[in-house]
Structure formats: C-alpha cells, structure tokens
Amino acid sequence: MCPASAERVSELLFNWGHGDQSAREELIPLVYVELRRIARRYLWKERPDHTLQSGALVHEAYLHLLHEEPPQWQNRAHFFGFAAQLMRHILVDHARGRLAAKRGAGAPRLALDPEIALPQKREVDLVALDDALTKLATLDPQQSRLIELRFFGGLSI
C-alpha cells in the first residue's frame, strides 16, 4: 500500500468510526487486496479441498464488519488485525460445522484404509488450534494475540 493510500485508509477508518457510511464504501476497494492476502494466508494452511475460497472469506468478514457498531479503529494495523481475527473465527465456525456434519447422525462407522486416510501436509486442525489459543489467552493474552496475528494474519513483529 503506497503512503498516499495508507493515509487515505487511516482517514476513512476514522470517518467510518464517526458515522460516515460513505467512508466505508470508499474504504473497501482500498483494503480489499490486503484482506484477500490475509484470507489466502489463512486458507493456505487449510486442507487443499477446503470449500471456502479467499474471496468468500473476505466477503463473509466484510458482512461481519458491517455490523460493528460503531467501529472505532485505532489505526490500519488495528483494522487489519481485527479482520484477521474475524476470518479466523469464520474458519473455526466453518470447521466446527464440518466436524458436526461428519459425525454422521447415526450412520455406521467404517474403518478407513490408513494409506488413503493420510492427511494432507498442510492440514491444520483449526478447532484444536482455536482451543489452544483460547487456553493460552487465559494465561497470557498478549502472547495469544501475538501468535494469532503472526500465524493467521501474516503480520510481523
């Protein structure tokens, strides 16, 4: 993001936080590329056949952002960090729904051939990771947030 765009994004975030809905509409095209980058980074860690695509994840996060009343972003990093956290929650909810559907509602269990059932290399258990981050947050909230933003948001220190 060029310095002029970065300044404009900061200005629009401030205006949106103070009730200017047109600022929100102007902001989205300016931040969309960065939001897609964050979404791609999340999905890269997912299994290859994941049903959500980066654009759908960004759009789902955008719908959630619309319901923030009123958003008080401190700066661009705060906004992108919040969006990254929101995407993580969307993916965790999606994973939980997928796990619930996999339980089969009474269907008989079948043993799988271990050679076929090997997980893909990049597969991450988002539910277990979310539980671990939640536990870490009770011990050290700052470390939990740091790991979340680094691992999921792709942000650096």
PLM feature segments, named:
Residues 3, 18-27, 37-58:
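Short, charged helix-capping/linker segments at alpha-helix termini
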Residues 32-36, 55-63, 76-96:
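Σ70-family region 2.3-2.4 aromatic/basic alpha-helix that recognizes the −10 promoter
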Residues 16, 150-151:
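Short helix-to-turn junction characteristic of helix-turn-helix DNA-binding domains
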Residues 70, 111-137:
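Acidic, proline/glycine-rich intrinsically disordered inter-domain spacer in sigma factors
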Residues 17-18, 41-48, 60-79:
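Sigma70-family region 2
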